[in-house]
UniProtKB/Swiss-Prot annotation:
Keywords: Cell membrane, Glycoprotein, GPI-anchor, Lipoprotein, Membrane, Signal, Trypanosomiasis
Region (Disordered): 83-102, 384-474
Record's subcellular location: Cell membrane
The organism of origin for this protein: Trypanosoma brucei brucei
Protein name (Swiss-Prot/TrEMBL): Variant surface glycoprotein ILTAT 1.25
Classification via InterPro entries: Trypano_VSG_B_N_dom (IPR025932), Variant_surf_glycoprt_trypan_C (IPR019609)
Membrane topology note: Lipid-anchor; GPI-anchor
Phylogenetic lineage: Eukaryota, Discoba, Euglenozoa, Kinetoplastea, Metakinetoplastina
Highest taxon above the source species: Eukaryota
GPI-anchor amidated aspartate lipid attachment residues: 484
GO annotations of cellular component type: plasma membrane; side of membrane
Propeptide stretches in the record: 485-507
Length: 507
């Protein structure tokens, strides 16, 4: 096994002997460059924080105004009726409710403008609700309050919170440090050499490159006055930095790197998932152990030998365009750079945004459902205003009986079915046995004659004291005595009518 490794080891030694100090000439840091460019692009092109739909926002705004209108309807009506240039003037304090005084006057004026756009039937409904204290008004008020409360609980999602975006603030902190450093200040004035800014395992870990990602990118990609035309990230940089003087060179180098990062990807929004993936891969690269010394804390390309690693920008043994975040004295214990901590904090904020988004969507659905309920309640309030005055119930028309007076027919031959009459006796051919066929009563000149006939029939039945004697068609045994069956039928009908009336009252 050792004999197979020897040629490789010798070739590395020969390479180290024969290579002059120069900047890297291939895209050895393309991977690290791409990962950090995700952070650079996020500064200006981070995926927008999503918010509620326009329909839900309008419902929330309208609910607050309707609640104000209901509580101050008379005043809102006056404002709505006034000319725009004439409203609102507080001529008398007793005319203006507290909810519309001083700084609140503008809100009431806006509510009045909304009131103007409401349909006439809805205005009638609001007037009805404003004057009633019943369950309908109470339920309507509760529904309006639920809408405004749901929006208030998710103020950022409904666009009512205008504070800066925490995730974006932390992305800027990752790029420029805290306090923020731009221009030549990206590389601190105390970093008079590239090794001081970018790190050396035998001396100190990176200073500027550990504080801000912009400096880390310059260490990975930039040229300097000793190592010009660096190709470690992209084809030859044109801004070479004199770390001892700087003089605008750091700012020029950063501008060039920033432009290269954005080239070809300017239109694409950076997502939380992309930032999270980039942060995870950068952390893995930093903690990866390399070479026989198991050097950790190295970001970027360097030719690792048995000795130190110096990120001085040259392409030579033990050197490279890199960032070192550990030292041999600390046994290569990695110190996580400030910019990576800030990036991970930004990702945590974006994850919190997603939680707020999920909860906000639920609130939005609830608000739209509550709006449907409020619309239904308003429609119920419209109904009483549409009802015409109740008219007195007309007395039922008394049907005229087209039949002939059957009672006048005392002979069976004159009692004809064609006249609506029926002979009730099966034995007699003469007598008072001609009756209306359909059972309806008839008017007669005597009037009292019918009553007399009924009384007679009832008396005939009551004379029968035994059940076996109570066999006449007009008689019926009720358990104790023989009674006229028509009287029993009338009592049964009266009882059923009374029962139906009671059931109707219950429901």
């Amino acid at each position: 096994m050792q004999s197979q490794q020897q040629p490789v080891f010798i070739s590395i030694i020969l390479l180290a002997i024969n290579t002059d100090a120069a900047a890297p000439t291939t895209a050895v840091n393309a991977r690290e460059f791409g990962l950090l460019c995700t952070l650079v692009r996020a500064e200006d092109n981070l995926e927008d924080r999503r918010s509620a739909g326009q329909a839900a926002k309008e419902v929330v705004a309208l609910a607050a105004k309707i609640e104000l209108i209901l509580a101050n309807l008379k005043h809102i009506e006056r404002l709505a009726a006034a000319e725009p240039e004439a409203a609102p003037k507080e001529s008398r304090s007793d005319e203006t409710p507290e909810a519309c005084k001083a700084s609140k006057a503008t809100v009431c004026s806006q509510a009045a403008q909304t009131y103007k756009t409401i349909r006439p039937d809805e205005k009638l409904a609001l007037a009805f609700l404003a004057e009633t204290t019943g369950d309908l008004r109470s339920t309507f008020n509760v529904t309006l309050k639920q809408i405004t409360a749901a929006a208030a609980s998710h103020a950022r999602y409904f666009g009512e919170n205008t504070e800066s975006r925490p995730a974006l603030d932390k992305i800027k902190k990752a790029l420029y440090g805290s306090p923020e450093a731009k221009g030549d200040a990206i590389i601190e004035s105390g970093d008079g050499t590239r090794s001081a800014a970018c790190g050396n395992t035998d001396g100190n870990a990176a200073n500027s490159a550990a504080k801000r990602a912009t400096a880390a990118l310059i260490c990975l990609c930039g040229g300097d006055n000793t190592n010009t035309g660096n190709d470690a990230c992209f084809t030859q940089t044109t801004a070479d930095i004199n770390y001892a003087k700087k003089g605008g060179e750091v700012e020029r180098a950063w501008t060039e790197i920033r432009q290269k990062c954005k080239a070809g990807a300017a239109a694409n929004k950076v997502t939380a998932a992309q930032l999270k993936a980039a942060a995870a891969e950068l952390a893995a690269l930093i903690h990866q152990k390399r070479g026989e010394k198991a050097v950790a804390g190295l970001l970027g390309a360097a030719q690792i030998n048995n000795g130190a690693v110096d990120c001085d920008g040259s392409e030579a043994n033990g050197k490279g365009s890199c960032v070192i975040l550990s030292t041999s004295a600390s046994k290569y214990k990695v110190e996580t750079p400030d910019w990576l901590n800030a990036l991970e904090a930004a990702i945590a904020d974006l994850e919190q945004e997603q939680i707020e988004l999920d909860n906000g969507r639920k609130a939005e659905a609830q608000i739209l459902a509550l709006n449907s309920s409020x619309t239904t309640l308003l429609a119920q309030a419209v109904e009483p205003t549409k009802q015409p005055p109740a008219k007195a119930a007309a007395a039922p028309e008394k049907k005229s009986n087209p039949q002939k007076d059957c009672n006048k027919n005392t002979k069976k031959r004159d009692c004809k079915e064609g006249d609506g009459c029926k002979w009730s006796s099966t034995e007699a051919t003469e007598g008072a046995f001609c009756k209306p066929k359909d059972g309806e009563g008839q008017t007669s000149a005597a009037g009292a004659g019918d009553a007399g006939a009924s009384d007679t029939e009832a008396k005939k039945c009551s004379d029968k004291k035994k059940e076996e004697e109570c066999k006449s068609p007009n008689c019926k045994w009720d358990g104790k005595e023989c009674k006229d069956s028509s009287i029993l039928a009338n009592k049964q009908f009266a009882l059923s009518v009374a029962s139906a009336a009671f059931v109707a009252l219950l429901f």
